[in-house]
Swiss-Prot record:
Record protein name field: Large ribosomal subunit protein uL2cz/uL2cy
BP-aspect Gene Ontology terms: mitochondrial translation
SUPFAM superfamilies recorded: Nucleic acid-binding proteins, Translation proteins SH3-like domain
PANTHER family per the UniProt record, alphabetical: LARGE RIBOSOMAL SUBUNIT PROTEIN UL2M, RIBOSOMAL PROTEIN L2
Alphabetized InterPro entries for the sequence: NA-bd_OB-fold, Rib_uL2_dom2, Ribosomal_uL2, Ribosomal_uL2_bac/org-type, Ribosomal_uL2_C, Ribosomal_uL2_CS, Ribosomal_uL2_dom3, Ribosomal_uL2_RNA-bd_dom
Family in the record: Belongs to the universal ribosomal protein uL2 family.
Lineage: Eukaryota, Viridiplantae, Streptophyta, Embryophyta, Tracheophyta
Keywords noted in UniProt: Chloroplast, Plastid, Ribonucleoprotein, Ribosomal protein
Broad class of the protein's primary localization: plastid
Matches recorded under Gene3D superfamilies: 2.30.30.30, Nucleic acid-binding proteins (2.40.50.140), Ribosomal protein L2, domain 3 (4.10.950.10)
Gene Ontology terms, MF aspect: rRNA binding; structural constituent of ribosome; transferase activity
Cell location: Plastid, Chloroplast
UniProt xrefs under Pfam families: Ribosomal_L2 (PF00181), Ribosomal_L2_C (PF03947)
Assembly information from the UniProt record: Part of the 50S ribosomal subunit.
Length: 273
């Protein structure tokens, strides 16, 4: 991904750095409208995810995470921007006339060919089961056979195949977690593109609001009814031994994963902080 630096003509563009990738014409049969976001509220209208709301209207692109066009070669026709994710997507024209979007693998260019199947070459962008050589870089990894890729889908994400034993493969995920997955599940070879997404600088607050992200307010400047850290005269301490969430739970060190999940035995090493 190429980063475009703005010329410092105004204060808002002084520190701006954005992706210079050109948008392409989206195929109408691969997009559909989606309802406006819930602004971080649940069905009862209670905020469950803070600092969300507003933003520009979006059309959802149908992404092929299953890669179930078996043994049919496809050609990359265009690389496009997707407002619903930080990774880019590419339009694939298959030999049987099918057209689909997939996540853009890093290094793939327009004109490259890809294919998915059980006996396909281990090449960037190809999708095949986890019966691959050790050390292979992977993304868009299935957890349940046939459900489609669920792991390592963000921009720049890459997992590594580190061991194989019996019917299971051991993967090291981008978070640092090491877990077992059935070697019949499929994955895509390579790394997700748009690696330099963290180098972008929006340059102004309005660009952040276009993305549907609202300002983040510190709990210490709120009222006691809104946050455990709130209240006091002037600049007051939080009044607690340890920081807390808006709901009163410990903010630091508390594990958020549910206990006794079915996949507990599949995780060999939990993610690194």
């Amino acid at each position: 991904m190429a980063i475009h630096l703005y010329k410092t003509s105004t204060p808002s563009t002084r520190n701006g750095a954005v992706d210079s990738q050109v948008k392409s014409n989206t195929r109408k049969n691969l997009i559909y409208g989606q309802p406006r976001c819930s602004k971080g509220r649940n069905a009862r209208g209670i905020i469950t995810a803070g600092h969300r709301g507003g933003g520009h209207k979006r059309l959802y692109r149908k992404i092929d995470f299953r890669r179930n066009e078996r043994d049919i070669y496809g050609r990359i026709v265009s690389i496009e921007y997707d407002p619903n994710r930080n990774a880019s997507i590419c339009l694939i024209h298959y030999g049987d006339g099918e057209k689909r979007y997939i996540l853009h693998p890093r290094g793939a260019i327009i004109g490259d060919t890809i294919v998915s199947g059980t006996e396909v070459p281990i090449k960037m962008g190809n999708a095949l089961p986890l019966k691959m050589p050790l050390g292979t870089a992977l993304h868009n990894i299935e957890i349940t056979l046939g459900k489609g890729g669920q792991l390592a889908r963000a921009a720049g994400a890459v997992a590594k195949l580190i061991a194989k034993e019996g019917k299971s493969a051991t993967l090291k995920l981008p978070s640092g977690e090491v877990r077992l997955i059935s070697n019949n599940c499929s994955a895509t070879v390579g790394q997700v593109g748009n690696v330099g997404v963290n180098q972008k600088s929006l340059g102004r607050a309005g660009s952040k609001r276009w993305l549907g992200k609202r300002p983040v307010v510190r709990g210490v400047v709120m009222n006691p009814v809104d946050h455990p850290h709130g209240g006091g005269e002037g600049r007051a301490p939080i009044g607690r031994k340890k920081p807390a969430t808006p709901w009163g739970y410990p903010a630091l060190g508390r594990r958020s994963r549910k206990r006794n999940k079915y996949s507990e035995n599949l995780i060999l090493r939990r993610r690194s902080k």
